[in-house]
Amino acid sequence: MIPFTSGKCYDRFPSMLFTYRVVIGRSFCQAHRGSLMAENRSKGAKNAIKVVHESSLTSKEQREKSKDDETPAWKIQKMAISKKLKGQRWNPSKRLSREEMEGLRLIKSQFPHLNASELGQQFKVSPEVVKRILSSKWRPTEDELGKLQDRWKQRGERIKQMFDSHQIQEKPLVVPKRIVINTLGSSPSVVATTRPSKNAKSNKRTKNKLHLLQQREHDHEHSE
């Protein structure tokens, strides 16, 4: 305990006043000391929990944690997807069109012995998708079918206009001349000669054939 009085108090104050003062001082010091101890106790508990958490991580985990803080968000998402797929290739589920759904129902009605897995392999979807399509009772009305057909017709017209406006004109390919560099036996100088391409030979042959046909027809007319 901390002493609260000195020798001068015995000379100046009576004994009753002295005892009253000592009791008040002791109670005040005990209350102040208790609050300080409680505050220190709470801080010590927080520090202890922090130390336990830091000590529970190994050096490797701490390095990985620092790397995760530095890696960008897109890379973290890509790593999470690869971890979820377990190294397999990303293959999102395929959605069937209305025509394909109607075709699936028609095949099932004509061949009832086919199961969901076989139909799923045919349409490249999971058996659960096939079961949901076959169990659904929704059918489009005539108005909805008419709207769908009009929409597909407008889509085809837009695509046709787009191709007509951006039509690519095919240009003939220019075949470069083949240059052969060789040396003559008599002179040491280098000589560059051009070799005709295969297309040029084929063109000459076609021209010669046409010329022969025209000449034969001309001779036949004169002979008659």
From Swiss-Prot:
Q: Where is the composition biased (Basic residues)?
A: 201-210
Location of the region described as Disordered in the Swiss-Prot/TrEMBL record: 53-72, 186-224
Gene Ontology cellular-component annotations: mitochondrion; nucleus
User: Origin, by domain of life?
Assistant: Eukaryota
Could you tell me where the Polar residues compositional bias lies?
186-200
Localization (cell): Mitochondrion
Plastid as a keyword of this entry, yes or no, is no
Q: Which UniProt keywords apply?
A: Mitochondrion, Transit peptide
Transit peptide (residue range): 1-42
Q: Name one Pfam family in it.
A: Neugrin
- Per the UniProt entry, the signal peptide is none
| InterPro entries xrefs | NGRN/Rrg9
Q: Where is the composition biased (Basic and acidic residues)?
A: 60-72, 214-224
Q: What does this protein do?
A: Required for respiratory activity and maintenance and expression of the mitochondrial genome.
Protein family membership:
Belongs to the RRG9 family.
Supply the name of the protein: Required for respiratory growth protein 9, mitochondrial
Source organism phylogeny: Eukaryota, Fungi, Dikarya, Ascomycota, Saccharomycotina
